[in-house]
Design a protein with these regions (language model features):
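Charged (often Lys/Glu-rich) extended helix/loop segments that serve as interaction or gating elements
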Residues: 74-196
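Active-site loop/helix belt of alpha/beta enzymes
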Residues: 1-98, 162, 188
Length: 196
């Protein structure tokens, strides 16, 4: 494992070249042949709106770099977040909607203690999420979704466009399958954990 959320494929090539040189050196200098190498590349997950999904391109770069290794042992990839992020969703219910100084707010029963994306700070980046039921009648407006904690930091999303959210509406956060719940402070103030 050499890091997480890497933004450039060039890092994978450099790391694999370094590992190749290291494995080859151990074999040549000490006569010890490693049969396996496990590599956790740290492929980035596009958690937020307008982030590009580079998974396929990154895997091609990694495959090419591994194929070109001088060391010929077995390489296993620990794919971590890159493969499991899309396997989970976080659902939270709207408990109250209000307006303050021309800004719309949805207060939900969850919060930052239950969902936390790598790089998310007070809703500054918009995670991929939607409302259920969708297709309500009304005007599409910008909303700020705030959690249930008594802190101004508990902002999950700012300026998301929703049509007529109300009490009981469900906000569905995507890409919650890897660390999104465990990176939060789940038991903060003895709040219940979300159901799995």
């Amino acid at each position: 494992f050499s890091g997480t959320q890497k933004k450039t494929a060039e890092k994978f090539s450099k790391e694999i070249a370094y590992l190749d040189k290291f494995c080859w050196k151990i074999e040549q200098k000490y006569g010890f042949t490693m049969s396996e190498l496990e590599y956790g590349p740290g492929i980035a997950v596009p958690y937020f709106k307008d982030q590009e999904d580079t998974l396929e391109a990154d895997i091609k770069v990694i495959k090419t770099a591994i194929s070109g290794m001088k060391w010929k042992g077995k390489v296993m990839l620990e794919m971590g977040r890159a493969f499991v992020a899309s396997c989970g969703y976080y659902l939270t219910c709207v408990h109250e909607c209000k307006k303050n100084n021309d800004r719309n707010y949805c207060i939900v029963d969850g919060g930052m203690h239950q969902i936390q994306y790598d790089g998310q700070i007070r809703g500054m980046y918009q995670p991929k999420c939607r409302m259920y039921p969708d297709g309500r009648e009304g005007k599409k407006e910008k909303w700020t979704i705030c959690g249930a904690l008594c802190t101004a930091n508990d902002v999950l999303v700012r300026d998301i466009e929703l049509t007529a959210p109300g009490e009981g509406s469900v906000i569905i956060f995507e890409n919650a399958g890897a660390y999104a719940m465990t990176e939060g402070m789940s038991l903060f103030l003895s709040h219940e954990l979300p159901a799995v």
